């Protein structure tokens, strides 16, 4: 039974992964563009925030973004293979030492900043 479920999940991932999914980790700043369906119809909305956690679980993979707007912390959990997602873009690579940044939930202002990670492999001569 588990093999059947595994095959089904792999088929669904192939169907839903028609867009480019960049490599990112927690601490990276992401810009997610998604379709929002409401009573007026369909519109496109972008959400830019720091990735607090990433959960890799096949078809049910997800990540949580956090941003501060008007002194209020806003969190958004996004499923990686959701059909409502238009694009995922990495704005900045963060340098952190943990996989889950739950300590960031209580931080605001300058204390919530994350250092930028410099990729040494793409160093120009």
UniProtKB/Swiss-Prot annotation:
Instruction: Give GO BP annotations, semicolon-separated.
Output: translation
Source species, domain of life: Bacteria
Gene3D superfamilies hit by this protein:
2.30.30.790
Q: Record's Gene Ontology CC terms?
A: cytosolic large ribosomal subunit
A Gene Ontology molecular function term of the record:
structural constituent of ribosome
Instruction: Give yes or no: UniProt keyword Iron.
Output: no
**Keywords, comma-separated and alphabetical:** Ribonucleoprotein, Ribosomal protein
Cited function = This protein is located at the 30S-50S ribosomal subunit interface and may play a role in the structure and function of the aminoacyl-tRNA binding site.
Family to which the UniProt record says this protein belongs: Belongs to the bacterial ribosomal protein bL19 family.
The protein's name is Large ribosomal subunit protein bL19
* UniProt lineage: Bacteria, Pseudomonadati, Pseudomonadota, Alphaproteobacteria, Rickettsiales
Q: Which gene encodes it?
A: rplS
């Amino acid at each position: 039974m588990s093999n059947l479920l595994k095959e089904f999940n792999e088929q669904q991932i192939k169907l839903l992964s028609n867009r480019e999914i960049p490599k990112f980790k927690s601490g990276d700043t992401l810009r997610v563009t998604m379709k929002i369906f409401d009573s007026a119809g369909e519109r496109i909305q972008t959400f830019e925030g720091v990735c607090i956690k990433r959960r890799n679980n096949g078809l049910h993979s997800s990540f949580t973004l956090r941003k501060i707007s008007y002194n209020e912390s806003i969190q958004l959990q996004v499923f990686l293979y959701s059909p409502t997602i238009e694009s995922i873009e990495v704005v900045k690579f963060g340098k952190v030492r943990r996989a889950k940044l739950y300590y960031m939930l209580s931080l605001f202002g300058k204390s919530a900043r994350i250092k930028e990670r410099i990729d040494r492999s793409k160093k120009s001569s």
